[in-house]
Swiss-Prot record:
Database matches in PANTHER family: AGMATINE DEIMINASE-RELATED (PTHR31377:SF0)
Family (UniProt): Belongs to the agmatine deiminase family.
Keyword flag Mitochondrion: no
Alphabetized InterPro entries for the sequence: Agmatine_deiminase, Peptidyl-Arg-deiminase_porph
UniProt entry keywords in alphabetical sequence: Hydrolase
GO biological process: putrescine biosynthetic process
Name listed for the protein in its UniProt record: Putative agmatine deiminase
Known EC number: 3.5.3.12
Pfam families referenced in this protein's UniProt entry, alphabetically: PAD_porph
Length: 370
């Protein structure tokens, strides 16, 4: 166990000025970060079920990549009992466990040096639709993770969650208007100003804007639940053939955009469709285990924003959520077809979904820079 309660060195320049860029998720990784789930007003049974699931995710990742887990001091002993022995526990305080959104975006340069971008965070909407209050501890998470690796830190003047962006490492950034242009994120910035900041801090050239994300996604439609890059020039889209499903017009609109765009290198996109699980709904028993607090209520009968697109690429494997016996095998086979050189590892992930996200949301990769 280590302690990361010290800030990282802050830079005054911007990554693009310094020759740094955000690499694609399939670039070599030196580590993956996760955070311990414990909020009783978001995770049933004070996180017990989620903790067991996070341990399985960490174990699946650990076969390919070292795993670090941020854990508040009060839960370290408990985490040591639950987590696989290969997971490095780091004392980091947090309001919740979404490492993708509160962790840093690590950027690299041609020499393999790594630095981190620390974005502003307001719990997915602040006082205008945010998911909990306060979020002060979450705002400190990225700097503490960067300190653990000895990386210098860029502080970006933009409210942004890691799950709201995907890049191909070759100049293209994909996102959703539903999230990035939402009035509860950066109300004083125009689309053009947001793009300019993303150019500065991700060093990207071209943007693919999808209008909306997955139906009932409480993050305001994060791209990482809806669509991702598989490799340069190829994307994977969350899809349903059911035209009566509320998800259909969202996926169809996204498909129309993807079919009529090119990436930063001028390539037309090859589009893979990944089937929607379910639809899935929160049960009475599952909702009863969540206590009242400042978090979003977990209501019986509420539709869950389940998506197989919410997977992690980590070195030689794909760790993806098992969500529905009717479609899990189909999703696994499609992923194997898309990633023939990767090992496809499914982890039962309903407990993560009940808390509002999935495997990609609870992980944040640290690229090797090589």
């Amino acid at each position: 166990m280590t302690n990361a309660n010290v800030d990282a060195t802050q830079l005054t320049t911007k990554p693009s000025q310094d020759g740094f860029y955000m690499p694609a998720e399939w670039a070599a990784q030196q580590a993956v970060w996760m955070i311990w789930p414990y909020r009783p007003d978001n995770w049933r049974s004070a996180g017990a079920y989620a903790q067991a699931t996070f341990a399985k995710v960490a174990d699946a990742i650990g076969g390919a990549t070292p795993v670090y887990m941020g854990v508040p001091q009060a839960f370290l002993a408990e985490a040591q009992k639950v987590m696989p022995s290969h997971v490095t526990l780091v004392e980091i305080d947090s309001n919740d466990c979404w490492a993708r959104d509160t962790g840093p975006t690590v950027v690299v340069n041609a020499e393999g040096e790594c630095r981190g971008v620390d974005w502003g965070f307001n719990a997915w909407g602040g006082h205008n639709g945010g998911l909990y209050f306060p979020w002060d501890k979450d705002e400190q998470v990225a700097a503490q993770m960067l300190k653990q690796h000895g990386f210098a830190r860029y502080s970006a003047p933009l409210i942004l969650e890691g799950g709201s962006i995907h890049v191909d490492g070759e100049g293209t950034c994909m996102t959703t208007a539903e999230c990035l242009l939402n009035a509860n994120r950066n109300p004083d910035l125009t689309k053009e100003q947001i793009e300019a900041l993303l150019r500065d801090y991700l060093n990207v050239k071209q943007f693919i804007w999808l209008e909306e994300g997955v139906y009932m996604d409480e993050t305001d439609g994060h791209i990482d639940n809806m669509c991702c890059f598989a490799r340069p020039g190829e994307v994977i889209l969350h899809w349903t053939d059911d035209e009566t499903d509320p998800q259909y017009p969202r996926s169809k609109a996204a498909l129309d955009v993807l079919q009529n765009t090119v990436d930063a290198q001028g390539r037309k996109l090859k589009i893979h469709l990944l089937p929607q699980p379910g639809p899935l709904y929160c049960t009475e028993e599952e909702s009863k285990g969540v206590t009242e607090g400042t978090g979003v209520p977990r209501t019986a009968g509420e539709r869950l924003a389940g998506s197989y697109v919410n997977f992690l690429i980590t070195n030689d494997r794909i760790v993806f959520p098992l969500l529905d016996p009717a479609t899990d095998d189909i999703a696994a086979q499609k992923l194997q077809d898309i990633f023939p050189e990767h090992k496809i590892v499914g982890v039962p992930a309903r407990e993560i979904l009940l808390g509002g996200g999935n495997i990609h949301c609870i992980t944040q990769q640290i690229p090797s820079g090589k």
